[in-house]
Amino acid sequence: MTKPIPAASGTAPAALFGASDVRRLAEEIGVRPTKTLGQNFVIDGNTIRRIVAAADIHADETVLEVGPGLGSLTLGLLDAAKSVVAVEIDPVLAAKLPGTVQQWRPGAAKDFHLVLADAMKVTELPVEPTALVANLPYNVAVPVVLHLLQHFPSLRHGLVMVQDEVADRLAAGPGSKTYGVPSVKAAWYSSMRKAGVIGMNVFWPAPKIHSGLVAFTRREPPVTSATREQVFAVIDAAFAQRRKTLRAALAGWAGSAAEAEQCLLAAGVDPTARGEVIDIAAFARIAEARQDRQA
């Protein structure tokens, strides 16, 4: 077992979990990672340091971590941030985590806040987070990111580790073959970019695919009189039939293909274009044009 050593000025970095530590902690509480919860625990300290460095966390920040699991990433975040608030859905893991933090980072235990909850249902936290850093379960990654960006405007930036294919989708721009609903909806809240790829062998159990890092920076949504819900409805309709022209794909949303064409023309969008080539600002203009025509 790696002995936990508090960080000190001018000394080596504080110890992080190795593979044996992760397996021992899991064994102590009888946990086996489950596919249902998308659990893959990071077992490599250098990977944790890489994630924390890529997240660009400042010493005065409060970080929101989703799915801390056994605490591999949590320890690295506590070393970098002012405080960490972690949201964990698994009650067994949640019960173990405070004790782990106390053992490995006793000086930072007071700066650690744990919330036992489903991240998709969290709308309030005990402290206001300024950054999101998380190793997200592959099966809920996009909904969780969008939910947190919606409900916590204090989140100014962050870094999420997701399935590499999902990372490509989140960071894609108009015209890319991976550009779709996740890309456009994420762009409502922030600018996203691919920040790296993580191999399979740094996890336990090892997933069958690589993971991708996505960094984001909050930005204001497009200036529009349309609501977020109205804009997102256009996005959903456009990509439900992504190979069709917008005139055809938005016919159901607008009431007819002819009405869809009028909305598109009013928004300055080519009716023969497809949704995969226009940006979030154009989707907002389309939603606004529809509202104006109904007024």
Curated annotation (Swiss-Prot):
Residues that bind S-adenosyl-L-methionine: 40, 42, 67, 88, 118, 135
Family: Belongs to the class I-like SAM-binding methyltransferase superfamily. rRNA adenine N(6)-methyltransferase family. RsmA subfamily.
S-adenosyl-L-methionine among keywords: yes
Subcellular location(s) per record: Cytoplasm
EC numbers, comma separated: 2.1.1.182
GO cellular component annotations of the record: cytosol
Known role: Specifically dimethylates two adjacent adenosines (A1518 and A1519) in the loop of a conserved hairpin near the 3'-end of 16S rRNA in the 30S particle. May play a critical role in biogenesis of 30S subunits.
GO molecular function, one term: RNA binding
Swiss-Prot/TrEMBL keywords: Cytoplasm, Methyltransferase, RNA-binding, rRNA processing, S-adenosyl-L-methionine, Transferase
Location, primary (coarse class): cytoplasm
Catalytic activity: adenosine(1518)/adenosine(1519) in 16S rRNA + 4 S-adenosyl-L-methionine = N(6)-dimethyladenosine(1518)/N(6)-dimethyladenosine(1519) in 16S rRNA + 4 S-adenosyl-L-homocysteine + 4 H(+)
Domain of life: Bacteria
Protein name from the UniProt record: Ribosomal RNA small subunit methyltransferase A
Signal peptide residue numbers: none
Keyword flag Zinc-finger: no
